[in-house]
Amino acid sequence: MAHKVKASFQSLKTMPADYRFLGSPISDHLETNLITPPNGHLKNGVNGTASSVGGMDSVNEDSPYSVRSILNGERSSIGDGDSILPLPESNDRKWSDTNVYARKKVLQFWVQLPNGNWELGKIMSTSGEESVIVVTEGKVLKVKSETLVPANPDILDGVDDLMQLSYLNEPAVLYNLEYRYNQDMIYTKAGPVLVAVNPFKEVPLYGNRNIEAYRKRSNESPHVYAIADTAIREMIRDEVNQSIIISGESGAGKTETAKIAMQYLAALGGGSGIEYEILKTNPILEAFGNAKTLRNDNSSRFGKLIEIHFSETGKISGAQIQTFLLEKSRVVQCTEGERSYHIFYQLCAGASPTLREKLNLTSAKQYNYLKQSNCYSINGVDDAERFHAVKEALDIVHVSKEDQENVFAMLAAVLWLGNVSFTIIDNENHVEPEPDESLSTVAKLIGCNINELKLALSKRNMRVNNDTIVQKLTLSQAIDARDALAKSIYACLFDWLVEQINKSLAVGKRRTGRSISILDIYGFESFNKNSFEQFCINYANERLQQHFNRHLFKLEQEEYIQDGIDWTRVDFEDNQECLSLFEKKPLGLLSLLDEESTFPNGTDLTLANKLKQHLNDNSCFRGDRGKAFTVAHYAGEVTYETTGFLEKNRDLLHSDSIQLLSSCSCHLPQAFASSMLIYSEKPLVGPLHKAGGADSQRLSVATKFKGQLFQLMQRLGNTTPHFIRCIKPNNVQSAGLYEQGLVLQQLRCCGVLEVVRISRSGFPTRMFHHKFARRYGFLLLENIAAKDPLSVSVAILHQFNILPEMYQVGYTKLFFRTGQIGVLEDTRNRTLHGILRLQSYFRGHQARCRLKELKTGITILQSFVRGEKMRKEYTELLQRHRASAAIQSHVKRRIASQQYKATVDASAVIQSAIRGELVRRCAGDIGWLSSGGTKRNESDEVLVKASYLSDLQRRVLRTEAALREKEEENDILRQRVQQYDNRWSEYETKMKSMEEIWQKQMKSLQSSLSIAKKSLEVEDSARNSDASVNASDATDLDSGGSHYQMGHGRSRSVGVGLSVISRLAEEFGQRAQVFGDDRKFLMEVKSGQVEANLNPDRELRRLKQMFETWKKDYGGRLRETKLILSKLGSEETGGSAEKVKMNWWGRLRSTRY
């Protein structure tokens, strides 16, 4: 029995004899298949003290263990490893042949000592049915030959697959696992099953480097990575959902193994970021669903199925998590030395001061729910650090900060509920809650009225015949109501968290139907006291074991029979009878439990009596004294105590408590109440309900769990399973300690021996004829178009020299031994790779040729299109240039005419003003002469005329000199004009040469275009004519431009002259007015007409000096203006205009003089 295992064996020497596999030579014949290992090690007995006599050198060449035989066996089993030797196989042949062979060949055996222990020894002699054995320390024993168990040769020590063992028996398997465990090789294959031994320490078998090695298949040693890699490859190749089923007892390492498998899948299918969220669900689920037990510091107290969805390219697209049967009773009750769920201790240790004040948190030792077990910490675990990791994970799965605070508030409320105490108020033991800190804190945290909380914990409303009766609760009833509320809050919180995680990991539209499911469910449990939780857990393990048996044994052998192949039947232990004990209706354990749960007067004792009454005839059931009964599970007998069975199965939460949660202001309790009401929509009809009880639920816990298991098995049945059996090496969770008795018991429960047997004698790989022919038919050298799939398949096998004993041809399928299909797959992959390379070369050549042709055509087309486009653009630009030139010339002409007219008008005004001044002066002279000239004498007249004549002569000389200067200036200007003309002719020459070059280029482009487009010969002449027209237009454009420049310069000069003249005239008028006013003012001051504090004579001298200075400056500016006007006149009107201006200036000067 599992719960009676107390072994602490250090080696197989001290192992009891009753720990034997079903296939040991005492109860069955010996398996004799030899699989040659890749390498070997020497073995010093089971406990390292006994050594082989003579070693390998003493082995005869005729022995099946000789080097020659081993090498021959290895050569004959390439790709599979199964070399079948002619040792005892039939049921009639016992150990007589082995004894005879042993007497001749000196082999080692496992011997069963009189005290029941196993020890390694060597046969010294045989006599009849007895043999003399030499064991460790030279002890000689005489034993029966039939009790001897042959030991494997030293070369097979530590093989990575148990199928490679020559002799498959209990001590051989156990020793091989221990050998590998001591070298940190914790993974061993047992056919299709991976055996994982928990090392209880860090081992260097994980990380990105190892992931990459298994991804590239450069490392073929057994590993969880290899199982996950096989699952994802088969999912993509076969388009069938996969499942990885991890089983083992509590503490065997199932949760860590599931996390390792998820890490590999995330590494291979990562890229979208969702894989990081999937990995971060582990800290959350472990914190809220795992706890420390006596057997495991991180025991999963719930089962979970993680279904990871993949896209068509093998990338993770989402995930979904389903949980089973959370152990709610652990919230309110813990055994000595155990802990409640990790999250409670993490919250107390890692909450920030702000959060601690908000939740009114204290240390874990202050809460009744946590201190009852006197265990607050785990060695090597920092709860505060884990709490921060949980908060980080909640952020990653998109749980908001507000929701996180609400979650922590619910946890604190559960802890404070445990501290709520009651006071007895009457003689009938009725109670009411004490109004202390605990009660007020709970009301504050869940957001309810404190009075309503008091009523919910101390009273119960009952409906009987449409009447409501208020029932006061006793102390025990109140405590049960308090604990039920705490358990319900925590269970609903756990379900709510799982729901939030699933929303974050939702696949949505990315779902493709391909998935890999990882099942991590509680292992088989057997304690000194087993309750309802162990009852359900072990029932689940029975169901999983049935699935394991069905897949590896039943379906396998049924398929062999249906397809009519030759095979050897392997017996295995079927647990169908135990499953029927649980599930049979109406007299099964679950049915009777539900029936008793519906009775209001049902008790745990009446349940036990009912079970004994109806199930005593079942071979898997035994009734014990009192409330106990025993069930013979596949892993051993377990005795259950029915105490608490009915209460836990009913899982009652009174409607008053649900109403309390729905009235809370916090949204989480409201959500919890809604989920409970939905669950209670269809009440269970029974005597309790008819009697008016307010408690009702749709299904009992056991029935609901049974339904979940059936759905789980249905989902797993639609997948290709991959099994991992986790083994716990010791009960003290210590690294390096290997308790062989405990390991042996677990190996029996896992059925490892039977798995290896059926794998060695069976054909694990099978394929339909048509699929095999379609997959490998192209490898045949001959034409197979007209052949049927079976003929094609046989031809493929013959072509690749597959040995007949390595495959079987069935009615519809081909069956292969392990490794044979791998040879064909390697050949197929190499051939496909060669085909792909050849195709890539040919397609590359075709693509390059097409690209070259395409480039040539594109170049011709581009040249034509660009030429046509440039011609259109040139024509358009030419038209725009001509139009703009015409507009510019018209505008400039208009501007010049307007400026010239303004200049002429201004000149006329100036001339009229000056001439008027001259006329006025002359009129004054004439008047003076007419009035006083008669009185002068002739001599004065002569003097006046002489002076006037001399003045005229001087003016003539000055005019001639100025004329000469102007002629010299004109000569200089003519020279400059000549230089400008020369430069302009050079520019014209250059422009003409550039035009000729451009015309030549145009002609060359036109000739190239005519060669490329021979069909456009008619358009060539038009293009040539266009070119000539364009050239003439360019010439016109140049001439027009020069004309525009000259006209523009001339008009600009005229404008400057007019502005200067207008300024001079304006200044003359202003200065004359100013000087006249000043002179008149000073004369009035001097004559006394005006009084002023100044010296008139000094001011007159000063004014005269200022006048002379201005006159000198003004004269200079007049001369400059003259020169400018003279130049303009010479350019516009020639010599006549110049003479007119000279005469005009002469008159002006004579007038001034």
Curated annotation (Swiss-Prot):
Residues 948-996 form a coiled coil. It comes from Arabidopsis thaliana. Residues 1024-1033 have a biased composition (Polar residues). The keyword Repeat applies. It comes from the Eukaryota. Belongs to the TRAFAC class myosin-kinesin ATPase superfamily. Myosin family. Plant myosin class VIII subfamily. IQ domain mediates interaction with calmodulin. Residues 104-153 form the Myosin N-terminal SH3-like domain. One of its GO terms (biological process) is actin filament-based movement. GO terms for molecular function: actin binding; ATP binding; calmodulin binding; cytoskeletal motor activity. Residues 581-615, 709-731 are annotated as: Actin-binding. Residues 157-829 form the Myosin motor domain. ATP binds at residues 248-255, 296-304. PROSITE patterns: IQ, MYOSIN_MOTOR, SH3_LIKE. This is Myosin-3. Residues 1020-1050 are annotated as: Disordered. Homodimer.
